[in-house]
Swiss-Prot record:
Its EC number is 4.2.1.10. This is 3-dehydroquinate dehydratase. NCBIfam families: aroD. It comes from Listeria monocytogenes serotype 4a (strain HCC23). The lineage of its organism: Bacteria, Bacillati, Bacillota, Bacilli, Bacillales. The gene is aroD. Belongs to the type-I 3-dehydroquinase family.
Length: 252
């Protein structure tokens, strides 16, 4: 499997890397969050820009990013606009979604960009090309807040993401039962054994918490923890998350 190196973080080896979302609505709130995150043992910060009140003003988005980057100069930043259809805060046009992501990828100030799989393929490929030209890695994602698809469908989506050029394919699903969590873990194990790229998977809500902890066993390279406000159901406090990941890593 290829390793994916972003600043001082290597995905695809050792314990899953911890990503903590920033969800501030204003520049002041984002600066406060970034200063708090300086004190926390994390690997990646995800800026959930769909929470930002001025997201439709690209100059203000870049200015906010500058403020975050000043406070967190060495921390890998994942730039994510989560669309409303995949559980995000704001519905925007496809045109704006791609303009926002391409513009920010070109700045060279983010390290990774989230690209949702279920968009026009030509647009997805263009954004991946723009990101890679600017040395930005691509997390390609899909989120199902209603259900857990069949194992074959989860595997198929992750393999498709890799085929399109994702550096880190990602899928998050909602379990209705413990069996659904096993389906996600089984799919993760299957893909991680044959994929070229590290993958990121999770089963959400309380039932799925085990999937956020057991990535090193089943093959998920990153997990999401909450420092202030969870951006998805089931996220664990980042300090507790690190403790459990370290415990499992020592035994593995």
């Amino acid at each position: 499997m290829n390793k994916v190196v972003v600043k001082n973080v290597t995905f695809g080896e050792g314990a899953p890397k911890i990503c903590v979302p920033m969800v501030g609505k204003t520049v002041a709130a984002l600066k406060e969050e970034a200063e708090m995150l300086q004190t926390i043992d994390l690997d990646v910060v995800e800026w959930r820009v769909d929470f930002f009140e001025d997201v439709k003003d690209l100059a203000k988005v870049e200015a906010a990013l500058d403020e975050i980057r000043t406070i967190l100069p060495e921390t890998p930043i994942l730039f994510t606009f989560r669309s409303a259809k995949e559980g995000g805060e704001l519905a925007v046009s496809d045109e704006f979604y791609f303009e926002l992501n391409e513009t920010l990828a070109r700045t060279g100030k983010v390290d990774l960009v989230d690209v949702e799989l279920f968009n026009e393929e030509a647009d997805v490929l263009r954004l991946i090309e723009t990101a890679h030209k600017n040395n930005v890695k691509v997390v390609m994602s899909n989120h199902d807040f209603d259900k857990t698809p069949a194992k074959e469908e989860i595997v198929s989506r992750l393999i498709r993401m890799e085929a399109l050029g994702a550096d880190l394919p990602k899928i998050a699903v909602m379990p209705k039962s413990a069996g659904d969590v096993l389906t996600l873990l089984d799919a993760t194990n299957t893909v991680s054994e044959k994929a070229n790229q590290p993958i990121i998977t999770m089963s959400m809500a309380g039932t799925g918490v085990i999937s956020r902890l057991a990535g090193e066993v089943f093959g998920s390279a990153m997990t999401f923890g909450a420092a202030k406000k969870a951006s998805a159901p089931g996220q664990i406090d980042v300090n507790e998350l690190r403790h459990v990941l370290d415990l499992l890593h020592k035994q593995f």
